[in-house]
A protein has these predicted regions:
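A cross-kingdom feature that marks ATP-driven nucleic-acid transaction machinery
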Residues: 14-183
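Single conserved hydrophobic/aromatic residue that forms the stacking wall/gate
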Residues: 1-7, 12
Length: 183
């Protein structure tokens, strides 16, 4: 049996993260402070971690969970496309002349169709703005026709946003509870 500890994201620029969440947590938070922790100051080290640092870390892990959910949904035939390729997209937005990214991409290589998603591990955010940016980013993923847009969030979206998404027919909301519903 082989285990992959380090994974390279499918993207334009090289990015390596530990595929195993335990190793990732250890090398991100424990190893830099191992002397303090072993010296008995573990509680102080933990209390010194800001909500922002933990939120950023959990946000990256949340993206991975969302991608895994898309894979499982595709295998079960519950996605609107038959996706077989999963990952992220990073690159330059020529209109803004800056780096941009798409948190999750699920693609059907045969039909050249894909869905893209934004993953928000925050208590609140501008839902309309996030959806507008997601639609803009569809033009950045070259070689695929983006047909569906997913907004993954820690908490449920507002009723107004959910109503707009349902009316669009191509936008879907997935909450943390939804991610674990079929397990």
């Amino acid at each position: 049996m082989s285990a992959s500890l380090v994974g390279s994201e499918m993207c334009i620029r090289d990015s390596y993260r530990f595929a195993d969440a335990c190793y990732d947590f250890w090398y991100t938070f424990v190893m830099p402070a191992v002397g303090d922790i072993e010296g008995g100051a573990g509680r102080i080290v933990a209390e010194g971690l800001s909500d922002e640092v933990l939120g950023t870390y959990l946000g990256h892990r949340f993206e991975r969970v969302c991608s895994q959910w898309l894979l499982e949904e595709s295998l079960a035939g519950r996605l609107p496309i038959r996706a077989s390729s999963f990952g992220q997209w990073w690159g330059t937005d020529p209109a803004l002349r800056q780096q941009d990214d798409v948190d999750v991409v699920a693609a059907d290589r045969a039909s050249k169709t894909a869905l893209i998603g934004e993953c928000k591990w925050r208590n609140s955010f501008d839902e309309t703005e996030v959806l507008e940016k997601l639609h803009h980013r569809a033009d950045l993923v070259k070689g695929y026709r983006i047909e569906f847009f997913y907004l993954f969030s820690k908490n449920p979206l507002s009723t107004a946003t959910l109503r707009k998404m349902k009316a669009s027919g191509d936008e879907f909301s997935v909450t943390l509870d939804d991610l674990y519903r079929h397990r």
